[in-house]
UniProtKB/Swiss-Prot annotation:
The gene is pcm. The lineage of its organism: Bacteria, Pseudomonadati, Pseudomonadota, Gammaproteobacteria, Oceanospirillales. This is Protein-L-isoaspartate O-methyltransferase. The keyword Transferase applies. The active site is at residue 60. It catalyses: [protein]-L-isoaspartate + S-adenosyl-L-methionine = [protein]-L-isoaspartate alpha-methyl ester + S-adenosyl-L-homocysteine. Pfam families: PCMT. Transmembrane segments: none annotated.
Amino acid sequence: MTSRRTRLRLIERLRKNGIQNEAVLEAMTEIPRHIFVDEALAHRAYEDTALPIGHSQTISQPYIVARMTELLCSGWKPKRVLEVGAGSGYQTAILARLSTQVYTVERIAPLLEKAKLRFKALKLNNVSAKLSDGRWGWPEQGPFDAIMVTAAPEQTPSELLEQLADGGRLVIPVGSGSEQMLKVYKRQGAEIEESSLEQVRFVPLLGGVVR
């Protein structure tokens, strides 16, 4: 159930659901999702559903991964990408295939250590990762051409908007409980354009670090 054929069936399902960016679909074909979940769940890795990864966190539904990546990377190859919430590392790995350098922050140490081992196994040499409260971003490495947030704050953190480079994009779920909206912010000089796209469901973006 983890064969390339199984992976390709998922890709065709994503196409039918409206994902059109070929670079995104190719990255999701090449990155094996089953290595980002526990072995007991590997047989479900290519279902279009979120799966638990421990510590009350999930690996996102493939459609959502594809949709957010398409919004972030469509029409260009960002050089510097910040990801807030590495989780299993799956979304990070997809971004690494579509950008020059990915900086990812994760607040739960055991998840981050597992993710780093997966990056090494996949020879993803363009990923830098650190244990941190993601709400603060990674200001020492900014500004970023693109920022993706994989957990939902109640409001968009101003610190992340400040780390967005001119011409850059931020893709983020915003809201609490079941009232979350997927938003895209685009910076043009001092102006930031905000778009609300569709309802989504993510774990909340929490503060602090768990060791």
